[in-house]
């Protein structure tokens, strides 16, 4: 299980989701990183879903993300 954790501007607590496949997490990571680099000039909404907690959904305005990280969650 892989976790993707994002930190938001003016928020002391990170948001995280879990995915089973590294490729899924890496794709989301790269998408968020592109938004952070300013490659997309429009205000975008990033929608994330978690595979560990079935009904966990997160929506974030992309320009508010200040950091993103991936790590493997060991059991």
Which residues does each PLM region occupy?
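Short, mixed-charge low-complexity intrinsically disordered segments
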Residues: 38, 42-75
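Acidic, Ser/Thr- and proline-rich intrinsically disordered linker/docking segments
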Residues: 1-37, 71-75
């Amino acid at each position: 299980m892989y976790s993707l954790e994002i930190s938001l501007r003016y928020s002391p607590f990170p948001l995280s989701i879990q995915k089973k496949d590294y490729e899924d997490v890496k794709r989301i990571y790269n998408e968020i990183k592109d938004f952070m680099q300013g490659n997309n000039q429009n205000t975008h909404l990033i929608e994330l879903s978690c595979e560990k907690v079935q009904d966990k959904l997160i929506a974030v305005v992309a320009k508010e993300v200040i950091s993103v990280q991936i790590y493997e969650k060991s059991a």
